[in-house]
């Protein structure tokens, strides 16, 4: 950031009084501009027969790989609204959003991923502009080796374990940077 979005004056990077981190501070109006983690919000859309809806990505990062419908939360929406919107945008699928199921903290890329359980309302779905294809998968059919992001893989593994136990439990994971695949964005 070079200029203040409030007044247009230059900003400088320094530690504000009574703070402990560098922040962008306007040199004229003294507004402190905080850069906080981005929220990635999505759904685990399940059809009544237990299959899960996945999207094959048409965009980078991880073009051509499979994922749950998810994306950046927008201002002015709740996390549940964001999960439903992303499912509609990426898979043209309508869902009833349920409970928050997983949270993954990824401090190395300044992101927090939130995934909700969701019920597909019908089988009228198709690829959105960010998806090459969308499909329903049983646990055994999921393309585990071509899942785009670690939070998606961990969430699906946990989801199927919980489903076998007959009860679902929220889980929270702090993910460190991957050491084996530096191109893995999460």
Predicted feature locations:
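Conserved hydrophobic "DFG−1" position in protein kinase catalytic cores
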Residues: 45-46, 54, 118, 136
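Short, highly charged C-terminal tails/helix-capping segments
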Residues: 172-178
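Conserved beta-strand and immediately adjacent loop positions that scaffold enzyme active sites
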Residues: 42, 51, 133
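Conserved Nudix-box catalytic region and its N-terminal flanking loop in Nudix hydrolases
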Residues: 46-89
């Amino acid at each position: 950031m070079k200029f203040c979005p409030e007044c247009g004056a230059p900003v400088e990077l320094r530690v504000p009084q009574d703070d402990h981190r560098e922040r962008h501070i306007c040199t004229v109006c003294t507004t402190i501009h905080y850069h906080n983690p981005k929220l990635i919000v999505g759904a685990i859309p399940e059809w009544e027969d237990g299959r899960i809806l996945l999207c094959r990505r048409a965009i980078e990062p991880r073009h051509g790989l499979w994922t749950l419908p998810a994306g950046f939360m927008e201002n002015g929406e709740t996390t549940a609204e964001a999960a439903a919107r992303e499912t509609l945008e990426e898979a043209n699928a309508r869902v009833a959003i349920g409970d928050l199921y997983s949270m993954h903290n990824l401090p190395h890329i300044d992101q927090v991923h939130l995934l909700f359980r969701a019920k597909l309302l019908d089988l009228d779905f198709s690829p959105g502009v960010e998806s090459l294809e969308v499909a329903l998968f049983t646990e055994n059919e999921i393309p585990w080796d071509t899942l785009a992001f670690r939070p998606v893989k961990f969430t699906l593994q946990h989801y199927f374990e919980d489903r076998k136990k007959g009860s679902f439990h929220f889980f929270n994971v702090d993910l460190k940077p991957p050491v084996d695949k530096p191109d893995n964005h999460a």
